[in-house]
Every structure is written in C-alpha cells, then in structure tokens.
C-alpha cells in the first residue's frame, strides 16, 4: 500500500512538473515583452523569444512569402489563368452595364476620378488648341495651300473644279429667271435711266422700259448657256483655283488673322465638347458602347493581363513585398502577435501542454519504481 502511494504521488508530482514546465516554456515564447535588469545585469530569458527575435522573424516571414509563396512566377501563372481573365472581363462588363443603366455622361465619369472636365476644357483645352494651331501656322506658313491640303482632297477638287461652271451658270440662270431677278433688273434699269435721263428719253421713242428689261433678262439668260460664256467662266474659275492652290498660307492669312481664327475655333471646339460631355455616353456613342460590350471587354481584359504580365517584375520591385510584410509585422503589438499565434496554433499548444503532463507522469512513475526498489 505504501509502495502504491509512492508511485501515485511521484506520477502526480511528475505530471504537474512536466505540464507546468511546458506551460512556462510556451509563455516564455511571448513574455516578458521587454528585458528586465537587476542592477546592471539583464535577467536571463528576458525578453521572451518572439519579442527578442521579432525583427528577425518578420524578415524571415517576408523572405519565405516572397521567395516561396507569392513568387513572380506564381502570380504570373495565376494572372494568365482562365479564371483571372474571366474575373477581369466580368468586372469590365459590370462597369459597362452600369454605364448604360445609369445613363452616365463623360462629365460624370470624369468627376468620379476628381476631374472637373468643364474647367479642364475651358482652361487647358483652349490653350492647347490655340497653341497647336499657332504652332502649325508658324511651321507651315510658307507652304502652299495645295501642299497643306490632304492629297485625296486636292485630287477630288481637281477632278470636280470644272463642275463649278455648270453650278454657277445654273444658279445664275435660276436667279435671272426668278421674280427676284426680274425685279433686280428693273431696279438697276431705273437707277441707270435716272442717271442718264436724255438717253432714256431717246429709247422711249422705240421701246418701253419693261421691254428693255425683258430683252436684257432674256439675253443674260441666253449667255448662261452660251459655249463661249461658259468657256470664259471655266477659264476664270480654273485660274483662280490654281492661284489659290499656289498661294502660301501667310499670303492667304497673316499671323494676326490666323490667331483670331485659332481663338474662335478653340472656343467653339471646347464649348461644343463641353455640351457633348453632358450627354449620356450611350446616347452620344451607341455603336461604340455596343462595341465595348460585345468585343472590347475581352480584348481589354487580355490587354490588361498582358501589360501586367510584362511589367510584373517592375511592379513587384516597386511594391517590395518583403519589405511591406516586414514593416507590417513590426507594426503589430506584441499582444496581438501572441493572440494571433495562439489562435492559429491553439490545438497544437494544448497538445504540447498535455504531452508535458503525460511525460511528467511517466517519468514520475519510473521515479516511484526507483524509489521503492533502490
């Protein structure tokens, strides 16, 4: 009976010592948070292991995550996966659907990124357009009009300049045949005869003013169809057209005239753009929105992935993942780190404490046997 009591007592004492030792060892991982001193001598095992090695732990965790977990290769593979492409494309589609559903205008879209589009147009827009136009004038002022116009436009004008004769003669004939043309001829005759009274008196002996006006009108109408008259008109138009093409820009418009045009044009363009910016994008550019929803979303997703993949190395260097993790861990309170580790390894820590009690009990059992038989 005495031997059994000794064995049980030794088992209990050994279990208590083993369990408490492991509990203290676990506590010493975190506590104390700062070193303690007796006189000038630091107390051993202060601070605890984790507070003492905090910076080293942060560095190692950052290194492990950067070199083995969130590696450039792994991120690149994940980025190029079908799942990532679908996620990016879905996000783009959602934004496009919101654009259509909410009837967002360009001005509203830019305001979401803190850009006052109207102010930008009225200040920077005016200055930019004026500057570009004036720079163009300075650079090309000595060049001919023909050299400044697009080749296709010059070719088109060359091919159709002869049509101006038909157009001009037709318009003249229509005008002369109209009531307005008749009235204008009569008015000019009245002015002429008032200035030349004697001549009118002589003509009245042979015909009336109305018959004179009618005769003049018929002759003018006939001239619009006469081959000789049309040849003269064609020659004049062709010569003037060629003269216009061969003129340098600065002969057609001097610097002050061009600057005035540039100012007026910049105001017109920015005002027009400002008005259009208030209209819903889906109303302003319906075909473009359809194109965005139908085809561009997939192309844009591929472009985003491609550009991110190309610049991933640079991005990761700029982000400095290791340094970011180190900095973040070093900002954590030690209480929070302790709580975090205990939450993660709670089950394992309890097993360690239980193992301490079990091993202590086993050692106590053998110590009891030794105490009985020795």
UniProtKB/Swiss-Prot annotation:
<comment type="similarity">
    <text>Belongs to the UPF0754 family.</text>
</comment>
<protein>
    <recommendedName>
        <fullName>UPF0754 membrane protein SAS1767</fullName>
    </recommendedName>
</protein>
<keyword id="KW-1003">Cell membrane</keyword>
<feature type="transmembrane region" description="Helical">
    <location>
        <begin position="4"/>
        <end position="24"/>
    </location>
</feature>
<keyword id="KW-1133">Transmembrane helix</keyword>
<dbReference type="InterPro" id="IPR007383">
    <property type="entry name" value="DUF445"/>
</dbReference>
<feature type="transmembrane region" description="Helical">
    <location>
        <begin position="354"/>
        <end position="374"/>
    </location>
</feature>
<dbReference type="GO" id="GO:0005886">
    <property type="term" value="C:plasma membrane"/>
</dbReference>
<keyword id="KW-0812">Transmembrane</keyword>
<keyword id="KW-0472">Membrane</keyword>
<dbReference type="Pfam" id="PF04286">
    <property type="entry name" value="DUF445"/>
</dbReference>
<dbReference type="InterPro" id="IPR016991">
    <property type="entry name" value="UCP032178"/>
</dbReference>
């Amino acid at each position: 009976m005495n031997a059994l009591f000794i064995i049980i007592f030794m088992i209990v004492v050994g279990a208590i010592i083993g369990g408490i030792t492991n509990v203290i060892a676990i506590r010493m991982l975190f506590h104390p948070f700062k070193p303690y001193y007796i006189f000038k001598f630091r107390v051993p095992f202060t601070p605890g292991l984790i507070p003492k090695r905090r910076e080293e732990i942060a560095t190692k965790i950052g290194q492990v995550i950067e070199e083995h977990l969130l590696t450039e290769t792994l991120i690149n593979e994940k980025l190029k996966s079908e799942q990532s492409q679908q996620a990016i494309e879905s996000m783009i589609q959602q934004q496009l659907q919101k654009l259509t559903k909410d009837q967002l205008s360009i001005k509203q879209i830019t305001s979401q990124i803190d850009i006052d589009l109207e102010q930008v147009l009225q200040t920077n827009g005016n200055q930019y357009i004026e500057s570009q136009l004036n720079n163009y004038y300075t650079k090309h002022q000595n060049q001919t009009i023909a050299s400044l116009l697009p080749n296709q436009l010059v070719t088109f004008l060359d091919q159709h300049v002869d049509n101006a004769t038909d157009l001009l003669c037709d318009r003249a004939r229509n005008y002369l045949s109209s009531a307005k043309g008749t009235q204008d001829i009569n008015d000019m005759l009245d002015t002429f005869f008032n200035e030349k009274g004697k001549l009118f008196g002589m003509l009245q002996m042979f015909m009336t003013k109305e018959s004179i006006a009618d005769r003049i009108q018929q002759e003018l109408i006939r001239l619009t169809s006469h081959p000789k008259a049309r040849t003269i008109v064609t020659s004049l138009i062709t010569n003037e057209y060629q003269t216009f093409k061969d003129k340098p820009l600065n002969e057609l418009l001097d610097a002050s005239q061009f600057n005035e045009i540039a100012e007026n044009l910049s105001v017109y363009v920015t005002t027009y753009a400002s008005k259009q910016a208030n209209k819903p994008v889906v109303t302003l550019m319906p075909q473009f929105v359809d194109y965005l929803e139908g085809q561009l979303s997939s192309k844009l997703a591929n472009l985003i992935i491609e550009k991110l993949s190309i610049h991933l190395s640079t991005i990761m260097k700029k982000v400095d993942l290791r340094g970011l993790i180190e900095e973040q861990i070093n900002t954590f309170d030690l209480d929070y780190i302790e709580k975090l580790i205990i939450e993660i390894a709670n089950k394992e820590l309890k097993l360690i404490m239980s193992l301490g009690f079990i091993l202590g009990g086993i050692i106590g059992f053998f110590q009891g046997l030794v105490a009985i038989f020795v």
